[in-house]
């Protein structure tokens, strides 16, 4: 058993279908899940740190810390439902979100990560929610899909709109017909030398 198979076996849930699809590489599928788990852990940890800002009577950082901790728990619930074995409905919720398109998860993570950063801009909220934001960006990139092959992009670039005439690739083809080249030999005869 290779190292990659061991890692994928650790991160896969039992009886899990492949919601992302076979077109994504294994390191992107499981790397995004691992990034989400790490992001959730640090969001909970730094959210707790922000909650302790109540000692300095900073209410906005208290609210940001609570939101960040809730976001961390939601991300942990969706990425690693095995951490919440005491709740019966966790697998149902995680399976429901897994059945949705990837851009749904990306939007959810990005929307949960932005308010703590806005409410209390500091290293704790920036790092904790920034990791969740990064996880949302990775899921968004996975939702966009992979880039087309070079031949497909070349064919799309050579298509012309409005006819079957091929595009001009001549070096002398210009935007303006009968345009004269620039000349730096002297001043124009009507120049007033002002």
Swiss-Prot record:
It is found in: Cell membrane; Cytoplasmic vesicle, Secretory vesicle, Synaptic vesicle membrane; Presynaptic cell membrane; Endosome. The record marks 79 as: Calcium ion selectivity. GO terms for cellular component: cell projection; endosome; presynaptic membrane; synaptic vesicle membrane. Channel activity is inhibited by La(3+), which reduces Ca(2+) influx and thus inhibits it's function in promoting activity-dependent bulk endocytosis (ADBE) in response to high stimuli. One of its GO terms (biological process) is synaptic vesicle endocytosis. GO terms for molecular function: calcium channel activity; identical protein binding. The chain crosses the membrane at residues 34-54, 59-79, 107-127. It is a multi-pass membrane protein. Keywords: Calcium, Calcium channel, Calcium transport, Cell membrane, Cell projection, Cytoplasmic vesicle, Endocytosis, Endosome, Ion channel, Ion transport, Membrane, Synapse, Transmembrane, Transmembrane helix, Transport. InterPro entries: TVP18/Ca-channel_flower. Coiled coil: none annotated. Belongs to the calcium channel flower family. Transmembrane protein which mediates synaptic endocytosis, fitness-based cell culling, neuronal culling, morphogen gradient scaling, and calcium transport. Regulates synaptic endocytosis and hence couples exo- with endocytosis. Controls two major modes of synaptic vesicle (SV) endocytosis in the synaptic boutons of neuromuscular junctions (NMJs); Ca(2+) channel-independent Clathrin-mediated endocytosis (CME) in response to mild stimulation, and Ca(2+) channel-dependent activity-dependent bulk endocytosis (ADBE) in response to strong stimulation. Homomultimer. Associates with the dally/ magu complex. This is Calcium channel flower. It comes from Drosophila erecta. The lineage of its organism: Eukaryota, Metazoa, Ecdysozoa, Arthropoda, Hexapoda. The gene is flower.
